[in-house]
Amino acid sequence: MSEALQLRAAEVQAKLALLRACLGKAGAAAIRLRGIDWFAWITAGGSSAVLQCAETGVAEVLVTQDEAVILTDEIEAARLREEEVQGGLNLGFSFHVSPWAQIELRERYVLGLAGEAVVLSDRPHNGEQPLPHALRLRRLVLGEAEQMRYRALGREAAEAMSEVLRAARPDWTEYQLAGAGAHALWRRGIHPALVMAAGERRLPLYRHPVPTHEPIGKRAMLVFCARRHGLYANLTRFVSFGAAPQEQSALLEVEATGLGAVEAGKSLSAVYHAFDAAYKHADRAEALNEHHQGGITGYLAREIVATPSTATGLEAGMAFAFNPSFAGIKIEDTFLLGAQGLDNLTYDPQWPAANVHGRQRPLWLEVT
C-alpha cells in the first residue's frame, strides 16, 4: 500500500470508528449516508456526485459495527472503485452493486443487515432516524489530512479567481466572466459548485446576482464556491476599470471586527453580534438584514450560518467563510481556525491587498 493510501486509510478508519461509537451510544444497527457531503467525508475525499447541483449522489455508504459498504449500481460501480474509492478494501469498504433497474435490491440488502433495528441517516427515509447532533458537529472539526486538502484547494481556487479577473474586460458579459471562472476551476480539477458574476449596473441591486447577458462595464464581482474532495473554498473578488469605490475601507473595518471575534471557546452567535456592532458603528445597521454574514464552512458551502442565537461553539480545526457586504460591495475568504488564530486558505499573495489590523485583506483590482 502506498503512503498516500495508508494515510487515507487511517483517516477513513478513524471516521468509521467514530460512526461505530455513535451506533453504540444510539443503540442503532446502521448509519446510512446518502449526501455527497457525507460521502466525501467518510471516504476521505471521494465523490459520489454526477449531477453537480444535487445533494445526493450515485452512491451511499452503509456502516454497521462489522461492515462499511458502498451501495451503488452497475452504471457507477467500476468508476467508483477505480477513481473515487481506490483500494476500497484497503480503505475498509466493500461494495454492494445492484442492477440500475432493480433499486429495491439495495433496500432488501440494507434490511438484511439492519433488520428491524434503528437506522440513522443524514437524510432519513422510511422510518430512519436523523444523525445525532453531536456527530454533525464533529464533522465540522477537520483533521490534519482534511486541512492539507483544504489548503491546496484554497490556494488553487484563489489562483483561478485572480487569473480570470486579470483577463476580464469591460465588454465581457456576466456570462463570459462566470464561464471563464468555471473554466479556470475545472482546469484545476475543482468543481464550480457556485459561480456568480455581476457587472456595474446589477452589482448594487442584488446580493445574489446570478449572471446574465449584460456587459460588465466599469466594474464587476466574481464569486466562487469551489468544491474538491467534498470541501468548499468560498471567495469573492472585484475588478474595477478605473478607481475602486471608497466604501471598501469601511467594509474592511466591519469584516475585521467580525473576524476578530472568531476564537476557540466562543460561540458563532458572538461573531454575529460582533458584525452587528460593526455595521452600526459604520452607520450601516440595515446591511445586516440585507444578507447573511456567512459562518462555518467545510463539506457544505455553509455548514452553519451565524445568527443571533447560534450557540455552536467554535473550535480549532473549524473552517469559516464570512461575507460582510454593503450594496454593491462584499468581502469573502475561507479561513481555518488554528492555534495561532485564523489562517486565510484563499489568500493569493499576487492579488492587491491591504494590511487591516495585522491581516492581509483583498482590495479591488484596479485596471487603468
Regions found by a protein language model. Give the residues of each.
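Active-site neighborhoods and metal-handling regions in enzymes and metal-associated proteins
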Residues: 1-368
